[in-house]
Each structure stands twice: as structure tokens, then as C-alpha cells.
């Protein structure tokens, strides 16, 4: 039997139950939202209510739908601010979800309103308990006379709990310890806050559920009570031990970055004694990512045990993915110290511990010599006083502690006026001795040592093997690439068989990408609104030079996108997995991935490609190709005022407007190396498109190539 038609409110009647005023509970708290989604009923005899165009926002729609017994969901048109009330949900018979570019779907949280997400386990038709029913897991039945029924699964009598401080909690608890209802994260009343879901994409800020986006003691939320800003939620911890870890542990040496080290070393390299761990109530911003409850430095607190991070006693451990084991110290003014004196396990051989050429571009984290002696910090003056090296474009200055990296004005220790390149720490901000080769020594990277009897020595690095590329990075150039001014702004006709076109649900090109494996595309994070957005209807087009190829064009391959995985923090990368592998041929080819941490030498000519805006310089309906010279980050930061990071790279800004524009983002910066084209950069948005003499910025792929390989390996 078809559901009864929706009863509509007269426009004037909506005011008594429409959008909430500041200090009141929002009616949208009763709904869960699916962005970019419409709900359709397959029976023509069943029709939704008419569109109401007199609503202020989605809250007012919720206020109209909530009191009606026959309204279970509504569409909200984000463009026209229209509202359509619905007498069914996605769980009703003969209904289906349809991805849309104009509407958001709001469904009641009641018995019908449980939306499957990547984390809540609502899969297929399995028994679940999304509403915490005391009877245990249940499901909707296929019997028209029985709406839902318990699955009679025996209870284990284990309460819902959170590990550690609950930063990974993604459940559906939406009330605080005192019973107050939580405020929606996407609303700014009754309490204003900085945790907008669109800015904290990895924190699971769904609807009004309890979360812990700031590393607090446990999950919490803003309340709907205007007098009480925020409260913790009633979620107990899962026992007294920390969440189980998967790393292989060692007690006498460490592997990798030392995440699995559980030894008893309690002094730093500089012999500062580690402080005993005690709990603190708030984590300072600069140490938030350490996810610890460690002691305040210099305090005389007694011994304590920390849940988040398993900090027992005062040992050097690495619980946050830093470059090596570390601890908080008792030395005033030195908050954190690294314990580099702990030896590395003999079976720990890291492929990235190698250098190319003479090692001038090495930016790894090795900090010991070939004899195992710890390197002296470049900023230190003991046991060896560093000598000034003025060698061509580079300089390593001593006699001051005002060390800088990048091309910045020198301080009082340099001849005025002056601006020199200063090498210091170039890959991370947590400390350590990164080892460049500032004087071009042909024997490789070196450092001053902590041994007073040995001024310097070469580092425990090997020369990287010759890079071997097999079936990637090969192409047959089909078009003349000499002088014709078409394509990318200032570009020319070209062939880039690994450059793909990303298409939205309407089949429109919106970004470029690179084919790095038969079933994997690498592109820019900024091409997508969220890391968890619905991908139904999104496709990748390959094998064509044209932005709008003719129907039946030979060689064109259209493959749906199956899933999306966002890269590490700060990478601005996304990997897209396709529903099936593509067919490789002359029109479709893989581009090679670079070695880890490889730095492209300045002056290298590389190629960008895409179908984006040409700014009037040519035809933007075909593939855009242009050649650009790579420049050093030091030179790039002169224009970008020091904002270019080590995980990014630049190409020079030319007098003519040549570069990538809207629609080219996510596309490759390909360099010809070892007779193959290698993916060195991914184009990310800049403030302007092809600004004259303005360097373009790319994500440096070699920094994140280990993550790329891991994702593709695990699928």
C-alpha cells in the first residue's frame, strides 16, 4: 500500500515551528543529511509533495517536516532554497537514492533514519542496533505486516566504550553526561565554534554526534543549552590499557622511526633527563598531534600513567609518528628532546636511506655517520665550531644561533646587505639533524660529529641504485609539439597518455589526474568537497585528446570511480580507485612514480598537461601541454614569502602567461628521467592563474610515494 500523501503547511503557518532562534534547539537535530542526494520513488502513483520556495534555510524545512506524522524526509535545494517534503525514506519499499548536484536529502533519525556511512557498519541487510535498542540488534523486515524485529542475538553484556581519549570514536551518541542534547556541528548557534565539518574532514563531525576533534580528555559536544557551551559525553574507556598497537616492539634498539621501541632509555642525545609522565587537562596547540597527556616540563609531579600513548615512567618512546623516539625533558626551555643515542637495529634497512649524485639534494632524516657516531646539530657550536662555507649559491654560516633556511635576509652575522641560502633542517619541524651536502663533496652527505676527536665524517648513506622503470612513462608522440599556441594557457598541442579527465555526474570535466596504476588515479585533494563524498556518477575518461570527445570515439575509455582515499595531512593528494582496470595502449599509459624523497634539480624542464582554461591563449577543448623549468624552493619562496614547504616544489614564472588554470588542477608535472616520464608534481590551486613571473606550486610526489605504494598494495 502506498504511503499517505504528505500534508503541507500553509506558508503563514510555518513561522510557529520554523528555524530556531539563537539559544533554542534546532529542529534539524532530528535529521541526518546526505549531501548531493535525492530520494526517488519508483512507483508513479506515489508522488512527493510540491516544492515550497518560501523557506529561509534547511532548518525551516526541518521545522515544517518534524511535526507531521506523514513526513519522514525532505529535499532542500541549496540554490533556490526550496523545500520538498517526502512521505518515505530510503528504507521504504520501491525507493532509491539518486545523486544530484542541486539537492541535499534530510531524513529523520528515528527508526527509518539510519544512514549508512563508511564507519557505522550499516551494510547490506545485516542486523544492527543504530539506536541503542535495549533488545539488541534488529532489522527492518520484508514482511509488509512487520516493520522491524529483533534479531535475537545473545548479548555479550559489554558496554559501548572508546579507546584512549576517543579521537577515533565515530558512534551515534548525541547527548552529554548530564543528558543535554548536542548541537549540530554544522550550526553556529546557540554556540559559535571553529569546528566546521568542511574544515575538519577527518574528524567525523557528522550531524550532532559526540566527537573529540581537539584531542580533549574524551568525546564531547557543544550543547543546545545556551547557558552550557560544551560537555563531555557519557562514553567510558575500554579498560585501563591503551588501544592495541600493531607495531613490532623492541627494547634494545629501534626500527624505522621507533614507534615500536619499548626500551628504558630516559635521556636525550644532549643528556637531558626525561620528565616523569603525569596527566594534564589540556594539550597545548603545538603538541596536539602528539596525542599525549604528558607532564608539564620542569614540574616535580609524581609518577603517573597516561592512557593516550601508554607513557609509563619517563622513557624515550615515539607515540606520534615523529622522526625518532623522544621525551619531555626536565631542562627549562627545552620542552622536547630526541633520543638519537638509541642505536638502530641491524636488520632495519630503509630503502630511502640513499642519495643521488653527490647528495646535494638529499633531504632525508639520517643523523649518524658511517661509524655510528651521532651528528652534531647544524645550529650547535659544540663540540665543533662550524666554519662558514661560501660555495657558489650555498652557504653554511656559523657564529650565531639565528639560523634560517630559505632565501631570507641575513642577520647581524652576515655582511650587509646580504641574502644567502642557509641550510639547516629542511624536511621536518620536530628536530633532528638533516644532512645536506652543502659543499658538493663528491663522496656524499656528511656532518660534524658529536665526537670531539672527529670533526666530521660521512653519513650512513649509500648511493641510490640506478632507477629502473619498466612499462611506465612511455609514449608515442602523435602531434607536432613545436610552436602551435593551443592548450594550457600559453601551451601547445601535445600528447600525455597518463593524463586523465575527471568527470562529475553531469559528465563535465572538472579536474585532471594521473594514471599511476591500471586501477589508480592520483589527483589533488582540492578537486573534491570532502574525503567521504558520494562518488556514484563520477567517472575517469582516458585515451582522448579532446575535452568533449564525440560519441564512439575510438580509444576513449570511461571508467567509474569506486572509492577515494585522501593522503596524509598536508599532502593535498587523493588516490582514486577505479571500478576496473583500464586497458593500456598508445593512448592510455602509466606514468612512473619517483624514488622516495627525490628532489628534482633546478633547471630541469618538465611538462604540465590538462584541459583547463587557456585565458584566451588558445583552444581549451583539447589537451593542454606546456614546458616549464623547475626552480629551487629557495628561489620560489622569494615570491611566495616563505610559504612553500619542503613537501612542495615550484616551476619558474615566465614573462608570458604559461601555466595551469582551473580545470588543470590535479594534473601531472612530468619530467623526462632515465628515458621515461616520471610524475614529480601534482598541480594544486594557486591564488592566481598563470600570473606573469609568478612561480607555480606543485605537491612534491616523492615525499608521499611511500603512502601511494602502500594504498595501492593494500587496495
UniProtKB/Swiss-Prot annotation:
Where does the record place the Kringle domain? 63-156, 160-238, 252-345, 353-464
Q: Name one GO molecular function term.
A: receptor tyrosine kinase binding
- State the Pfam families in the record: Kringle, PAN_1, Trypsin
Keywords, ordered alphabetically:
Disulfide bond, Hydrolase, Kringle, Protease, Repeat, Secreted, Serine protease homolog, Signal
Which superkingdom heads the taxonomic lineage of this protein's source? Eukaryota
Domain (Peptidase S1): residue spans on this chain: 488-713
Q: Taking every annotated instance into account, which residue ranges of this chain make up the domain PAN?
A: 21-110
- Alphabetized CDD domains for the sequence: KR, PAN_AP_HGF, Tryp_SPc
Q: Where in the cell is it found?
A: Secreted
Q: What is this protein called?
A: Putative macrophage stimulating 1-like protein
Amino acid at each position: 500500500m502506498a504511503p499517505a500523501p504528505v500534508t503541507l503547511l500553509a506558508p503563514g503557518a510555518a513561522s510557529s515551528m520554523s528555524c530556531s532562534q539563537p539559544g533554542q534547539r534546532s529542529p534539524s537535530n532530528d535529521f541526518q543529511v546526505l549531501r548531493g542526494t535525492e530520494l526517488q520513488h519508483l512507483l508513479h502513483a506515489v508522488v512527493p509533495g510540491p516544492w515550497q520556495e518560501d523557506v529561509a534555510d534547511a532548518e525551516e524545512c526541518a521545522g515544517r517536516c518534524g511535526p507531521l506524522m506523514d513526513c519522514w524526509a525532505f529535499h532542500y535545494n541549496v540554490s533556490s532554497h526550496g523545500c520538498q517534503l517526502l512521505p518515505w525514506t530510503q528504507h521504504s519499499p520501491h525507493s532509491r537514492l539518486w545523486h544530484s548536484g542541486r539537492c541535499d536529502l534530510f531524513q529523520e533519525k528515528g527508526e527509518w533514519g539510519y544512514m549508512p556511512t563508511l564507519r557505522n557498519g550499516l551494510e547490506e541487510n545485516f542486523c544492527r542496533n543504530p539506536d541503542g535498542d535495549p533488545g539488541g540488534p534488529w532489522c527492518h523486515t520484508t514482511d509488509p505486516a512487520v516493520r522491524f524485529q529483533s534479531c535475537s542475538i545473545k548479548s555479550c553484556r559489554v558496554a559501548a566504550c572508546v579507546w584512549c581519549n576517543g579521537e577515533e570514536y565515530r558512534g551515534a551518541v548525541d547527548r552529554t553526561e548530564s543528558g543535554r542534547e548536542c548541537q549540530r556541528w554544522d550550526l553556529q548557534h546557540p554556540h559559535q565554534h571553529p569546528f566546521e565539518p568542511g574544515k575538519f574532514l577527518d574528524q567525523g563531525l557528522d550531524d550532532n554526534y559526540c566527537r573529540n576533534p581537539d584531542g580533549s580528555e574524551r568525546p564531547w559536544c557543544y550543547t543546545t543549552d545556551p547557558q552550557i557551551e560544551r560537555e563531555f559525553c557519557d562514553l567510558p574507556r575500554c579498560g585501563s590499557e591503551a588501544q592495541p598497537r600493531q607495531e613490532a616492539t623492541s627494547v634494545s634498539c629501534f626500527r624505522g622511526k621507533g614507534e615500536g621501541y619499548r626500551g628504558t632509555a630516559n635521556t636525550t642525545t644532549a643528556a637531558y633527563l626525561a620528565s616523569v609522565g603525569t596527566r594534564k587537562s589540556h594539550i597545548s596547540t603545538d603538541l596536539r598531534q602528539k596525542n599525549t597527556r604528558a607532564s608539564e616540563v620542569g614540574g616535580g609531579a609524581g609518577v603517573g600513567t597516561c592512557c593516550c600513548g601508554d607513557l609509563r615512567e619517563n622513557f624515550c618512546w615515539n607515540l606520534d609518528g615523529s622522526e625518532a623516539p623522544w621525551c619531555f625533558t626536565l631542562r627549562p626551555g627545552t620542552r622536547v628532546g630526541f633520543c638519537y643515542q638509541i642505536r638502530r637495529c641491524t636488520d632495519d634497512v630503509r630503502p630511502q636511506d640513499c642519495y643521488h649524485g653527490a647528495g646535494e639534494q638529499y633531504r632525508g632524516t639520517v643523523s649518524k655517520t658511517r661509524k655510528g657516531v651521532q651528528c652534531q646539530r647544524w645550529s650547535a657550536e659544540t663540540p665543533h665550531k662550524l666554519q662558514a662555507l661560501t660555495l657558489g649559491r650555498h652557504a653554511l654560516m656559523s657564529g650565531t644561533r639565528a639560523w634560517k633556511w630559505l632565501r631570507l635576509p641575513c642577520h647581524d652575522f652576515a655582511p650587509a646587505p646580504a641574502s644567502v641560502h642557509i641550510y639547516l633542517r629542511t624536511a621536518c619541524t620536530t628536530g633532528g639533524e638533516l644532512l645536506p651536502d652543502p659543499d658538493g663533496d663528491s663522496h656524499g652527505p656528511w656532518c660534524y660529529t658529536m665526537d670531539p676527536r672527529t670533526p666530521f665524517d660521512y653519513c650512513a648513506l649509500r648511493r641510490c641504485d640506478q632507477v629502473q622503470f619498466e612499462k611506465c612513462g612511455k609514449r608515442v608522440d602523435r602531434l607536432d609539439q613545436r610552436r602551435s599556441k593551443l592548450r594550457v594557457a600559453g601551451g601547445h598541442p601535445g600528447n600525455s597518455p597518463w593524463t586523465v579527465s575527471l568527470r562529475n555526474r553531469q559528465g563535465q570535466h572538472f579536474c585532471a589526474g594521473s594514471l599511476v596504476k591500471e586501477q589508480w588515479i592520483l589527483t589533488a585533494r582540492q578537486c573534491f568537497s570532502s574525503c567521504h563524498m558520494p562518488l556514484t556518477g563520477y567517472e575517469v575518461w582516458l585515451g582522448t585528446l579532446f575535452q568533449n570527445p564525440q560519441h564512439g570515439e575510438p580509444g576513449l575509455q570511461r571508467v567509474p570511480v569506486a572509492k577515494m582515499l585522501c593522503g596524509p595531512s598536508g599532502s593535498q593528494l587523493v588516490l582514486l580507485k577505479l571500478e576496473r582496470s583500464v586497458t593500456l595502449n598508445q593512448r592510455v599509459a602509466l606514468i612512473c612514480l619517483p624514488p622516495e624523497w627525490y628532489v628534482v634539480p633546478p633547471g630541469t624542464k618538465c611538462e604540465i598537461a590538462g584541459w583547463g582554461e587557456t585565458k584566451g591563449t588558445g583552444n581549451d577543448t583539447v589537451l593542454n601541454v606546456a614546458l616549464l623549468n623547475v626552480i629551487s624552493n629557495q628561489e620560489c619562496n622569494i615570491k611566495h614569502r616563505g610559504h612553500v614547504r619542503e613537501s612542495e616544489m615550484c616551476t619558474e614564472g615566465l614573462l608570458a602567461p604559461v601555466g595551469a588554470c582551473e580545470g588543470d588542477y590535479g594534473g601531472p608535472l612530468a619530467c623526462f628521467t632515465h628515458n621515461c616520464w616520471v610524475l614529480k608534481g601534482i598541480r594544486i590551486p594557486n591564488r592566481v592563474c598563470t600570473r606573469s613571473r609568478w612561480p607555480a606550486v606543485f605537491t612534491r610526489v616523492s615525499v608521499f610515494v611511500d603512502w601511494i605504494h602502500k594504498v595501492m598494495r593494500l587496495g
